[in-house]
Amino acid sequence: MEQKWEEAEKILSWKEMQTGVYSYHGIERRGTNDYGRPISVVTLERGGVKKMFYAPASLYWDLKNRSETNFIKYEGTQTSAKGYDYPVFMYSA
């Protein structure tokens, strides 16, 4: 149990990402939330440092539907008409 807690501390919120380009190293599904949307963790690298982030559902589905992705560019957030912030990503092979 102790090991799982330490691992959880290393996983950051997607909201902690800095804008810019990251090398993509994979995404792992860890279950679903109360609304049936995937809870997943994405591993990204920037400046030689790998970090794990909880991925928004949109990122999970985008990456699962792409044949090849090597880089992800995080461009920040936009606000929906309902007032929710959501992330904006671009992808390249």
Q: Where are the model-predicted features located?
A:
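Short nucleic-acid-contacting surface segments enriched for D/E, G, S/T with interspersed K/R
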Residues: 17-20, 58-75
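A short macromolecule-binding patch
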Residues: 49-55
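OB-fold/S1-family single-stranded nucleic acid-binding modules
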Residues: 76-93
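OB-fold ssDNA-binding interfaces and closely related basic DNA-contact patches used
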Residues: 1-49
